[in-house]
Amino acid sequence: MKKDNNIINFVNFPKQHVPLLKIAAATVLKSEKIKRYQVNFIMVDDKEIRKLNTKYRKIKRITDVISFLVVPEFFMGDIYISKTRSQEQAKEYSNTWQQELAYLVIHGLLHLCGYTDYDAVNKTKMFTKQDKIFKCLFYRL
């Protein structure tokens, strides 16, 4: 039997949300044909995510999600999600918190896959893909 070395970790996330979030992550990885991976999702407070954003992106503000591809050859990365921002955005977009976390999991992973949202063309491409995956998870017919 082949041993599966692929790992998806969730740190500091509510346990009841993890099963669906793993499905969201696996859906992105499958759609992008990523076969070997180790991805860590870490929930942090606003202070920590602002610190990461300032240090690595030179942007001195809070963000909802920030992704780091650590070892590209093996698709190993860390994705940090702000607990407070995700809760605020859930209310703002009329989602449950679980839905918003799934959306940010999808978004963060797409960044690791090379998608960007820094200009209109790439943002449209990324958000189209993101919305399609999100709808598959939550709005099956």
Swiss-Prot record:
Annotated binding of Zn(2+), by residue: 107, 111, 117
Tagged with keyword Cytoplasm: yes
Cofactor(s) needed by this chain: Zn(2+)
EC numbers on record: 3.1.-.-
Cofactor notes: Binds 1 zinc ion.
GO molecular function: metalloendopeptidase activity; RNA endonuclease activity; zinc ion binding
GO BP annotations, alphabetical order: rRNA processing
Localization (cell): Cytoplasm
Stored SUPFAM superfamilies: Metalloproteases ('zincins'), catalytic domain
Gene3D superfamilies for this protein: Metalloproteases ('zincins'), catalytic domain
Enzyme class: hydrolase
Keywords: Cytoplasm, Endonuclease, Hydrolase, Metal-binding, Nuclease, Ribosome biogenesis, rRNA processing, Zinc
Superkingdom of source: Bacteria
InterPro entries noted in UniProt: MetalPrtase_cat_dom_sf_prd, YbeY
One GO term describing the cellular component: cytoplasm
NCBIfam families: rRNA maturation RNase YbeY
HAMAP family the UniProt entry points to: Endoribonucl_YbeY
Similarity-based family: Belongs to the endoribonuclease YbeY family.
Name of protein: Endoribonuclease YbeY
